[in-house]
């Protein structure tokens, strides 16, 4: 029931746990595989690679224990602290990830779309992600370039382009979505 912290990721070697986590919410990605569909999970016998924010989310819910390479357990608070030291704006990125997960969405990396996250209603291989999420630092304003970029990106990949930030005063996640419209 554990994953080993290796750099910016947590590796789940136990194949049964890896399959269960992926089946449960499409957490992580299997080493050497792209999008694995739910009905293909039992054929995979590779480790599951979790991003730090995914591992933290699962650890906070008691689904996994994260351990160091020497086997020492890393509690969720310490994992968050490590994340802050390695990833810029880790707390905000995690809050945004958690926000969507808590609403029941499947959240995957949006890197191939030039975004922070791709957000699915059901999961990769089942439906297409209707939304790509880009992180906007809280102290930075929205520029016309951000809006133009968002419109073009959203249109080119047929997804709602969403700017996400966390308000400093309240810690609330705020979203601003752009969809392409033909006039």
Swiss-Prot record:
Its EC number is 4.6.1.16. The gene is endA. The active site is at residues 120, 128, 159. One of its GO terms (cellular component) is cytoplasm. HAMAP family: EndA_short (MF_01833). Pfam families: tRNA_int_endo, tRNA_int_endo_N. PANTHER family: TRNA-SPLICING ENDONUCLEASE SUBUNIT SEN2. It comes from Pyrobaculum neutrophilum (strain DSM 2338 / JCM 9278 / NBRC 100436 / V24Sta) (Thermoproteus neutrophilus). It comes from the Archaea. The keyword tRNA processing applies. Endonuclease that removes tRNA introns. Cleaves pre-tRNA at the 5'- and 3'-splice sites to release the intron. The products are an intron and two tRNA half-molecules bearing 2',3' cyclic phosphate and 5'-OH termini. Recognizes a pseudosymmetric substrate in which 2 bulged loops of 3 bases are separated by a stem of 4 bp. Homotetramer; although the tetramer contains four active sites, only two participate in the cleavage. Therefore, it should be considered as a dimer of dimers. This is tRNA-splicing endonuclease. It catalyses: pretRNA = a 3'-half-tRNA molecule with a 5'-OH end + a 5'-half-tRNA molecule with a 2',3'-cyclic phosphate end + an intron with a 2',3'-cyclic phosphate and a 5'-hydroxyl terminus. Keywords: Lyase, tRNA processing.
């Amino acid at each position: 029931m554990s994953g080993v912290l290796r750099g910016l990721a947590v590796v789940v070697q136990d194949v049964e746990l890896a399959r269960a986590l992926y089946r449960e919410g499409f957490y992580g990605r299997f080493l050497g595989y792209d999008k694995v569909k739910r009905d293909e999970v039992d054929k995979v016998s590779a480790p599951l690679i979790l991003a730090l924010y995914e591992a933290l989310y699962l650890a906070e819910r008691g689904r996994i224990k994260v351990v160091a390479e020497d086997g020492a357990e890393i509690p969720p608070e310490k994992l968050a602290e490590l994340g802050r030291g390695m990833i810029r704006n880790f707390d905000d990125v995690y809050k945004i990830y958690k926000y969507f997960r808590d609403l029941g969405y499947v959240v995957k990396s949006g890197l191939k779309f030039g975004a922070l996250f791709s957000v699915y209603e059901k999961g990769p291989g089942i439906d297409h992600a209707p939304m790509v999420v880009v992180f906007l630092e809280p102290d930075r304003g929205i520029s016309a370039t951000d809006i133009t970029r968002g419109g073009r990106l959203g249109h080119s990949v047929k997804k709602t382009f969403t700017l996400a930030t966390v308000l400093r005063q309240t810690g609330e996640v705020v979203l601003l979505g752009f969809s392409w419209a033909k006039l």
